[in-house]
Amino acid sequence: MTTLNSTPRADGFHMPAEWAPQTQVWMVWPERPDNWRLGGKPAQAAHVAIAKAIARFEPVTVAVSAAQYDNARARLDMPNIRVVEMSSNDAWVRDSGPTFVINDRGEVRGVNWEFNAWGGFDGGLYAPWNLDSQLGGKVLEIERCPRYVTEGFVLEGGSIHVDGEGTLITTEECLLNRNRNPHLTREQIETILGDYLAVDKVIWLPEGLFNDETDGHVDNFCCYIRPGEVLLAWTDDPEDPNYSRCHAALSILENTLDAKGRAFIVHKMPIPGPLFATEEECAGVDQVHGSQERNPSVRLAGSYVNFLIVNGGIIAPSFDDPMDEKAREILQKLFPEHEVVMAPGRELLLGGGNIHCLTQQQPAPHKN
């Protein structure tokens, strides 16, 4: 594998928007019993449903441990799904995997961020995370993609969204958290994002969704739907702890121009619930020192914004909630040329994330 000493921007590469043409989507099989209940079996069933939904639109590669390889291969029984053996600590490939970048000559490379399990030993979600730290490089090696390495700079893919035209959205709650890059200022972080993703403007939302254990990842709160337009998780209930977070984000978006000088059009997506785990669901998770505790009294950070755009499709979570159909209608209206597929999201939410968190798109080569 070729490791490059330059930066994507210096080499003419940039991170494309999620709606750009894709070669495939990467996923990692969920199995750790101290995060996924009942040995991961319910989450694996949801994983299969999501992988098969994506595979209707484009190829999927699922990385799985040697112990679970036969099981995963048997259940992911579609020609468009490739299963490869790869060790990992958990399934969150959006965060542990690489970010792909492209240029105008038909080349694809990858950025291999440093990963510390959402905070390391200062509020991180599990230890060790050494296998997840290797995952980005392994994916790039399988794909024969040259890589850029950001030693000393921690970033998860779920903490950023880009429009492919120079603007990035993130949250202060995550990227300025002391457990990520305490040695860097906001300005230094913006410079690194510019160098490695070729963005010209970073828009900082104060916080993400309430109780998001990733420290407020933007992909669970606000996402691009096209240049100049975003979809923001929303509640009109002043008693909801998300109320102030949503309004603070809206204020920033309504009073900020993007890198192209455009004012934002902000669409609102209702937040489901409030949603909570049951005592039975929490009891099904192994209790291991150092892992995230599951508590039925703690509100879950459910969000319909945590969807994935694929070639011709939108794969969005459903929660067996009355708001599910409204969410589907909103997404279909916003993406009239895509087919909206609602996939089971509750088991993923119980594990701490959702569809966007558990997937990583690989862009197709592009030539001008």
From Swiss-Prot:
Q: Name one GO molecular function term.
A: agmatine deiminase activity
What SUPFAM superfamilies does the record tag this protein with?
Answer: Pentein
* InterPro entries per UniProt: Agmatine_deiminase, Peptidyl-Arg-deiminase_porph
Pfam families of this UniProt entry? Answer: PAD_porph (PF04371)
Q: In which pathway does it act?
A: Amine and polyamine biosynthesis; putrescine biosynthesis via agmatine pathway; N-carbamoylputrescine from agmatine: step 1/1
Q: What is one process in the GO biological process aspect for this record? A: putrescine biosynthetic process from arginine
Q: What are the catalytic residues?
A: C357 (amidino-cysteine intermediate)
What reaction(s) does this enzyme catalyze?
A: agmatine + H2O = N-carbamoylputrescine + NH4(+)
- State its Enzyme Commission number(s): 3.5.3.12
Q: Which UniProt keywords apply?
A: Hydrolase, Polyamine biosynthesis
HAMAP family in alphabetical order: Agmatine_deimin
Its subunit composition reads: Homodimer.
UniProt lists the family membership as follows: Belongs to the agmatine deiminase family.
Function per UniProt: Mediates the hydrolysis of agmatine into N-carbamoylputrescine in the arginine decarboxylase (ADC) pathway of putrescine biosynthesis, a basic polyamine.
What is the protein's name according to its record?
Agmatine deiminase
Report which gene this protein is encoded by: aguA
